[in-house]
Regions:
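Double-stranded RNA-binding/processing signature
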Residues: 1-133
Length: 133
């Protein structure tokens, strides 16, 4: 079994994955980053940690964050983002289709970077988001 904490997939292997598969992994990576950030910097009551996490991981917030990141992405990252954004999925009632597609793009980007072993870039992009949050 591969070391799931230190992945380094090739670009080809990442590009063979489905867009929604990348978003599925990216959703978990993004939420873990948010939870870690809040535990290290925020109010430590469980109620507040949960409330603050929800405010960062919902589709509306992710859509806003995605738009803030777009100018900072290189071509490859933009392609991963577009793959997720253009994936066919159904938006929940709590988000508009546009918000949901932007959020899915952000998650696909984070999933691809994680699978590529680009934790340095994940940290850089996540830091940009939290500086503006």
């Amino acid at each position: 079994m591969e070391n799931l904490f230190a992945l380094s997939f090739s670009k080809n292997r990442i590009n063979e994955m489905s867009s929604l598969g990348l978003a599925h992994i990216g959703d978990a990576v993004y939420e873990l980053l948010c939870r870690s950030y809040l535990c290290c910097t925020g109010d430590h009551t469980v109620k507040n940690l949960h409330k603050d996490t929800i405010s960062l991981v919902n589709a509306q917030a992710q859509a806003v964050f995605a738009q803030k990141l777009l100018p900072h992405l290189n071509e490859e990252e933009q392609a991963w983002f577009r793959r997720g954004k253009n994936a066919h999925s159904h938006a929940p009632k709590s988000a508009s289709p546009k918000e949901y597609s932007l959020a899915t793009g952000l998650e696909a980007l984070f999933g691809a970077l994680y699978l590529a072993g680009r934790t340095d870039r994940l940290q850089e992009l996540f830091t940009l988001l939290m500086e503006e949050a």
